Amino acid sequence: MYQETKRYIERKLKKIEYIYTKLPDGYEDIEIRYRKVRDEIGILQNVVNGLTYYEYGGTVMKNVAHWANIVGESTNINAIKREDIYTNTSTVGMQLAHTVSDKSLKEVCTEFSTAYENIAIEKRKMNEKMEDVTDELNNLKKKCKQIDHQRHIVKNIRYDLEELLQSNVYKEDIKNRLEKKLESNGKEIQEQMTDFVHLSMINGIIVKIAKIHKEFCEAAGNHLEKFN
């Protein structure tokens, strides 16, 4: 690992033009495609995290908590905890139900509280499903690390071989060994990148994210149906 890191730094500091060495046909094209798919994984992880945890932060969340605490103080009800926005919204409805005397308004506040309590439950169910998606993305990320490690090895081999050939001073057996390593390692990692691009299941994961979120939105809408 130390030698690979050292060679990586050397390649960055002392760049050379590749004249005598070639990668397997199609290697660079599949590498570009692989890197695009790899980078999409990180973007999808951010999307999943955003959809999973949005209810725990932000200005809206702080305002709801602040409002609920004020209502609680005015009615001698214990101030709410900093939970998710749906649970806090439910608490707001419950606390308002305790502050009003009008029976009809009290009923609306109670129904409001119940609806958002149920939405909070649905959101927790959605979050659990999103955890499975996160696991899938993490597994793909681990595979990417393995592929990237092998890609760096190929780059180091090519660099060493090109440097050797440009020096015009080398032993034939060393040249032959590096050429064989470049060819074999290059083809192997090319196959891995090709398989990853075709089997990464990115499209399936995107569909799964949308489906999970859709199920939550529909369930939340059903709980709010009575307020039409």
From Swiss-Prot:
Subcellular location, record wording: Spore wall
Carbohydrate-modified residues: 88
Family affiliation: Belongs to the SWP12 family.
Cellular component terms (Gene Ontology): spore wall
Predominant place of localization: other
SUPFAM superfamilies referenced in this protein's UniProt entry, alphabetically: BAR/IMD domain-like
UniProt GO BP: sporulation resulting in formation of a cellular spore
Coiled coil region boundaries: 115-195
Transmembrane segments: none
Protein keywords: Coiled coil, Glycoprotein, Sporulation
Protein name: Spore wall protein 12
InterPro entries reported in the protein's UniProt record: AH/BAR_dom_sf
